[in-house]
Amino acid sequence: WAGKGGSSMQYALCGLPDSTDFVSLWLCWGNLTVEQQADLKDFQAKGSRAVLCWRAGDIGDNLTPGGNDDAVKEAFWGFDPKDEQSCIEAAKKYALAIVDTCNKYNIDGFDYDIEDWGTLMNSSMPSVPNAFMKTLREEFDKTGKMLVADIPGGAGWLSFYEVLSEETVLSLDYIAWQTYELGHSGLDSFFEAVRRSHPNVFKEAMGKSIVTATFERAVDKHYFTEQQRS
């Protein structure tokens, strides 16, 4: 994403269709250029939204002055990875830093791409990621911003989803399931596994789900090409 550059809209949000609901700004953690800020403002004026998006296995990923070295992150955010309470407090600080960035640049929220384990997404300390998400939700509610989670498709990835509490699942605006190459039967099996993971909130989770697809790479793409030929 480069923003508006002359007459070209190739790398601009405003080059997207007017019907676009929202866009996740992959690997954007602030420091927007003048061109990006102008593009974002015009994009939002059309009724569309844009949210920050990155992977964060560890507390402080991408927002820690000095880089992503473990020792640097632990020192800056003030936590011991073996001490649960210090991790919870640091996760809340990290969430507030994301909120501050969204407010500074008038970004519409945060899309948490959940694909990595670490000091933030920790299966042995589920209170940490859930405190992080709860803080984001509470702060975003004050300004009408969005909270989204990306989770890879495939039953083997659902351990990330299972770490999220039912309260966290219900608090999300959207869940984007990255099911790029699954065919019809694979999707059926996957969402049956989703149901088993959090049966009490399955209906609500499905109501806020975005299911990704790459038809060109899907295992059953031949069904579509055969229909086109007939």
Per-region residue spans from a language model:
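Secreted glycan hydrolases and related glycan-binding modules that recognize and/or cleave
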Residues: W1-S230
